[in-house]
Amino acid sequence: MKSSMKMFAALLLVVMCLLANEMGGPLVVEARTCESQSHKFKGTCLSDTNCANVCHSERFSGGKCRGFRRRCFCTTHC
């Protein structure tokens, strides 16, 4: 009886380890996004598209309007 309980516990442990590995799936890592206020954008930022276009001219990957004062912030992967 004791050996069958030990065998059952060992088998249960192996099954749990296998299931834990299967549930994890591949690990995906996203790059961080860094922001910097645009130096060329003038005025209140009302359009993300306009902000992104100005940021592209500053060699950033994109841009968005942010904050209470609606400033253009350029974004890039860092």
UniProtKB/Swiss-Prot annotation:
Q: Does the keyword Disulfide bond apply?
A: yes
> Which cellular component terms (GO) are annotated to the entry?
extracellular region
Annotated signal sequence is 1-20
| Subcellular location per the Swiss-Prot or TrEMBL entry | Secreted, Cell wall
Q: Which cysteines are joined by disulfide bonds?
A: C34-C78, C45-C65, C51-C72, C55-C74
Give UniProt keywords alphabetically: Antimicrobial, Cell wall, Disulfide bond, Fungicide, Plant defense, Secreted, Signal
Main location, first listed in the record: secreted
- Family from the record: Belongs to the DEFL family.
Q: What is this protein called?
A: Defensin SD2
Chain's gene name: SD2
